[in-house]
Structure formats: structure tokens, C-alpha cells
């Protein structure tokens, strides 16, 4: 669930902000809010999505025919009507707050009302294997650039520019960090524990990665060795290449972990090697689903085009998923507004899992 945090300053998260990874054995809950203005086409659109670890579990879209917080995972559907009513009202309040925030931001940055602008925010908490808070965070952005962020001490702010410094001063005067910290250490952790228990079969599972190495000639003198890990969960994984036992980190091309479209993830790491020296290179894979790290080599006799076909198909699905996720995430971070003074603020409510409203009121 998300709780509404007290009113003061907080806004804007970078459009490129991605889900951050947690430590092994830890779990996270995050909400991503986005408000986008669209002059001449009605009120700004507001979307929020909630994630537990790498699984989306709720979503709200102000453009829906009947805007409500909606379930996105089977295990959250067991929550009763009061939960959905409360989360819906929290999201609607945040949507209204962010609409005001967008207007205030125009004044902060001396911008015209003719253009489209975006406010984004990510906030949430991580807990360790013992269920205790490891880290809390709240980061905001405006038009894809950092705006203001809660520091790791959960008691101070880092402002990215002079406009954000206005917000920082107002939040400090209102002791906004204290209220947000209370949410992160209390409500956020409590709801995360509840979700982990209710969704334990999904959220606390460990799907073992399917691994193999492929060989791709570049010229008569060089070839690319690519180490694949497919179908794993959770998303945290380590792929490294070694040459004669020495890490090749600087020479490794490593892609970001990607959703496969079926609730699992994919990743690969590649190195360019001299032809004829392939046997000197080993790929090392570490993942929660493995009893011990794997060591792989390219086996010339075992290479097949079948895995590649499967990967291409998976990446095709991935493309659709990523596009949808980007649209959602870039249209899904949560801010709240209120008032005309020109100061961002958050509003906290005691029993909503969402965490905090952000608004620019004086």
C-alpha cells in the first residue's frame, strides 16, 4: 500500500530512472509516479505503478474510463474493497497535487504554458532477510532532470538546482523529511512484509537461469563469445568473463537485465577474443537460484541455432514489454500538489501503502 505523506515540497524524477537493485536476500517496494501536462488536450495525465522486487502489483491511470487503483498480480487481488478504495483515493489526490505542481514548476522555471512538461517520482524501501529496513528513498525529477532527493540519512535533501532549493528550504521548515522517514521506516516496511507473505510463492521464488555460450565470428582473426542467462528470477544476477582466470571486466560488453515477458529475466555478457584462443575464456554466473556459481566455456560441437531463435523470440516479446514499461514508467511516478504558493509538498496518511503525496504549495 501507499501512504500519503505530509504536505511540503517534493516533485520530479528523471525519466530515465530505472528500478534500482537490492542486495542479495533483500526485498524492495517502490512506487513510480508520472504526471504529464498536455496543453489543449485536457488535464495532465497521471500514472502510478507499484513494484515489489521485480514484480508490478498495482497500477493507476487517470485516463482510464473509471480511474481506480487496479491489481497487476494475482496475490494482491485478495485485498478487500477498503484497500482498493483507499489506494484509489490516495492516487487521485496525488494526481491533483501533481497537476498543481506542474503549474507551479512553470513559474519556478519561467516556462510557457504552451509546452508539455513531466513530473516524476520514485519512492520506497528495501528490507533485509530479517525484515528490517535497509534503505529508504524518495527521488523526484522535472522534465527528465533530477530535481530533489532524500539523502540516505533520511533526514536531509539534495537539491539539483536553484528551483529545487526553494523546495528544499520549504521542506526543511516543514520538517518534511521527518514525516517521510516515519513512513519509510514504518508503513512502507509493514506493507512490504505483508506483500512478501501474501505473494511468497511468486515473490520469494528463485528461478534458475538457463545458460549457454554462443560464438560469433567477426573476422578471420577475431570472434565474439556471448554468455547467455535466460529465464531467471529475481532479476539480480552476475555475469563475468575471465581469461586464464583473470577478470575481463573492462573488455566485457554487458547489457542491462531485461524482462522476458513471462515474469522472468534475460541477460548476456560478451567479449571479443582472438580466433583460436576461445578455450582460454570462461563465463562465470552467480544467481540466487544456483546452489553454486556456474563456469561456462564455448563448446564448438554443442553450438546450436535453437537457443538463438528462442532468444530472438524472447527479445521480440521483450521489446513490447520494455516499450510498455517505458511508457508506464515515464508516465508513472507519483507527485502531489496543492496550493498556489509555489512549493512542492507531500501528504502522509497512516494506512495507505503508497507513501507520500508531493505538492508545490506555499
From Swiss-Prot:
PROSITE patterns the UniProt entry points to: IG_LIKE, IG_MHC
Region (Disordered): 335-362
Any Pfam family matching the protein: C1-set
Entry's Gene Ontology BP terms: antigen processing and presentation of endogenous peptide antigen via MHC class I via ER pathway, TAP-independent; antigen processing and presentation of endogenous peptide antigen via MHC class Ib; immune response; positive regulation of T cell mediated cytotoxicity
Connecting peptide, as annotated region: 299-308
Region (Alpha-3): 207-298
Side of membrane Cytoplasmic, spans: 333-362
Bilayer topology term: Single-pass type I membrane protein
UniProt region (Alpha-2), positions on chain: 115-206
Cell compartments where the protein resides: Membrane
InterPro entries linked to this entry: Ig-like_dom, Ig-like_dom_sf, Ig-like_fold, Ig/MHC_CS, Ig_C1-set, MHC_class-I_related, MHC_I-like_Ag-recog, MHC_I-like_Ag-recog_sf
Glycosylation site list: 110
A Gene Ontology cellular-component term: recycling endosome membrane
Stretches assigned to the Ig-like C1-type domain: 209-295
Gene Ontology molecular function terms on file: peptide antigen binding; signaling receptor binding
Keywords, alphabetical: Disulfide bond, Glycoprotein, Immunity, Membrane, MHC I, Phosphoprotein, Signal, Transmembrane, Transmembrane helix
Compositional bias annotation for Low complexity: 343-362
Subunit-level organization: Heterodimer of an alpha chain and a beta chain (beta-2-microglobulin).
Entry function: Involved in the presentation of foreign antigens to the immune system.
The protein, known as: Class I histocompatibility antigen, Gogo-B*0101 alpha chain
Naturally occurring in which organism (per UniProt): Gorilla gorilla gorilla
Amino acid at each position: 500500500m501507499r501512504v500519503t505523506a505530509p504536505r511540503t515540497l517534493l516533485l520530479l524524477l528523471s525519466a530515465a530512472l530505472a528500478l534500482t537493485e537490492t542486495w542479495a536476500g533483500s526485498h524492495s517496494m517502490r512506487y513510480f509516479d508520472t504526471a504529464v501536462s498536455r496543453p489543449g488536450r485536457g488535464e495532465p495525465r497521471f500514472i502510478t505503478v507499484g513494484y515489489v522486487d521485480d514484480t508490478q502489483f498495482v497500477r493507476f491511470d487517470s485516463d482510464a474510463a473509471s480511474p481506480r487503483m487496479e491489481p497487476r498480480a494475482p496475490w494482491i487481488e485478495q485485498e478487500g474493497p477498503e484497500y482498493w478504495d483507499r489506494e484509489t483515493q490516495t492516487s487521485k489526490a496525488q494526481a491533483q497535487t501533481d497537476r498543481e505542481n506542474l503549474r507551479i514548476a512553470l513559474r519556478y522555471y519561467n516556462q510557457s504554458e504552451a509546452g508539455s512538461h513531466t513530473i516524476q517520482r520514485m519512492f520506497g524501501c528495501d528490507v533485509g532477510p530479517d525484515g528490517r529496513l535497509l534503505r529508504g528513498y524518495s527521488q523526484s525529477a522535472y522534465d527528465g532532470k533530477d530535481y530533489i532527493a532524500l539523502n540516505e540519512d533520511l533526514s536531509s535533501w539534495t537539491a539539483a538546482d536553484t528551483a529545487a532549493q526553494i523546495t528544499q528550504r520549504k521542506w526543511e521548515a516543514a520538517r518534511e523529511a521527518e514525516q517521510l522517514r516515519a513512513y519509510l521506516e514504518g508503513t512502507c516496511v509493514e506493507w512490504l512484509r505483508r506483500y512478501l507473505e501474501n505473494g511468497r510463492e511468486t515473490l520469494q521464488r528463485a528461478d534458475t537461469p538457463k545458460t549457454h555460450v554462443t560464438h560469433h565470428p567477426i573476422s578471420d582473426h577475431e570472434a565474439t563469445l556471448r554468455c547467455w542467462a535466460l529465464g531467471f528470477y529475481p532479476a539480480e544476477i552476475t555475469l563475468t568473463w575471465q581469461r586464464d582466470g583473470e577478470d575481463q571486466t573492462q573488455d566485457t560488453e554487458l547489457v542491462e537485465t531485461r524482462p522476458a515477458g513471462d515474469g522472468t529475466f534475460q541477460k548476456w555478457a560478451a567479449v571479443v577474443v582472438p580466433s583460436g584462443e576461445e578455450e582460454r575464456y570462461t563465463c562465470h554466473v552467480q544467481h540466487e537460484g544456483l546452489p553454486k556459481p556456474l563456469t561456462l566455456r564455448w563448446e564448438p560441437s554443442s553450438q546450436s541455432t535453437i537457443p538463438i531463435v528462442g532468444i530472438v523470440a524472447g527479445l521480440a516479446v521483450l521489446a513490447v514489454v520494455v516499450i510498455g514499461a517505458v511508457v508506464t514508467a515515464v508516465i508513472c511516478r507519483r507527485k502531489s500538489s496543492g496550493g498556489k504558493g509555489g512549493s512542492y509538498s507531500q501528504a502522509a496518511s497512516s494506512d495507505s501503502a503508497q507513501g507520500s503525496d508531493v505538492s508545490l504549495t506555499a
